[in-house]
Amino acid sequence: MYKLVLIRHGESTWNLENRFTGWVDVDLTETGAAQARQAGKLLKEAGMGFDVAYTSVLKRAIRTLWHVQDEMDLMWIPVRNEWRLNERHYGALAGLNKSETAAKFGDEQVLVWRRSYDTPPPALEPTDPRASYDDPRYANVPRNEIPLTECLKDTVARVMPLWNESIAPDIQSGKRVVIAAHGNSIRALVKYLDQISDDDIVGLNIPNGTPLVYELDADLRPLRHYYLGDQEAIAASLAAVASQGKAR
């Protein structure tokens, strides 16, 4: 049996402000840093260890991983920073307040933009300063692969090559893998692992800073999965994530 641990980054500054974030590189709040440290403590208490870590190229996920590694005394393990694990690109919604956007366009439209499988938000213009074409962290990414907007289907399409070419082979070689990433890149992985339908994925939310443990068979099919931590607090966190895109 193999184990895989997925962790969404701790609360970010724009999570706190209820803004669409996507590829904008915001940092953790103090609460987010504490969530990440607690995740590391829970993993250590559960007797888990890791041989390799994957994260995105965005600091909220990177710093979350740092805190987890620090709590587990695993700062020395190899880390792969992969743009394919970035959050879904929210296009022209990046930086907008979710509740204000819902008040303007309606809860239903914002739910579609946030959670539908194949409907992307309005795209950025290529000349928009929020576009990532000139960002040095994407210097080796083909321009046509740098998005101006994404739906979850697009996110799945960029995450899966990394899974197939790197993450899955690492797991099957016996390496213990932890992935610190983002709500939608983790939803993409969970959709694949649990074979969730395009319709049902709309209802899946991922809480901040909470280790999600998968136990996998020899073919990397899930035997079971579970969150580490206080289950009531996790349920409250999931409910809070679900309500972010509603008008107030």
UniProtKB/Swiss-Prot annotation:
Superkingdom of source: Bacteria
Against Gene3D superfamilies, the record matches this protein to:
Phosphoglycerate mutase-like
Signal peptide range in chain numbering: none
For the biological process aspect of GO, one term held by this record is: gluconeogenesis
Keywords noted in UniProt: Gluconeogenesis, Glycolysis, Isomerase
Reactions mediated catalytically: (2R)-2-phosphoglycerate = (2R)-3-phosphoglycerate
| Amino acid composition bias (Basic and acidic residues), ranges on this chain | 127-137
Q: Which residues bind substrate?
A: 8-15, 21-22, 60, 87-90, 98, 114-115, 183-184
Hey, which pathway is this one from?
A: Carbohydrate degradation; glycolysis; pyruvate from D-glyceraldehyde 3-phosphate: step 3/5
Q: Which GO terms describe its molecular function?
A: phosphoglycerate mutase activity
Which PROSITE patterns does the entry link to?
A: PG_MUTASE
Could you describe the subunit structure of this protein? Answer: Homodimer.
Q: Which family does it belong to?
A: Belongs to the phosphoglycerate mutase family. BPG-dependent PGAM subfamily.
Entries under NCBIfam families matching the protein: pgm_1, PRK14115.1
In UniProt terms, what function does this protein have? Answer: Catalyzes the interconversion of 2-phosphoglycerate and 3-phosphoglycerate.
Indicate what this protein is called per its UniProt record: 2,3-bisphosphoglycerate-dependent phosphoglycerate mutase
Q: What's the source species for this entry?
A: Cupriavidus taiwanensis (strain DSM 17343 / BCRC 17206 / CCUG 44338 / CIP 107171 / LMG 19424 / R1)
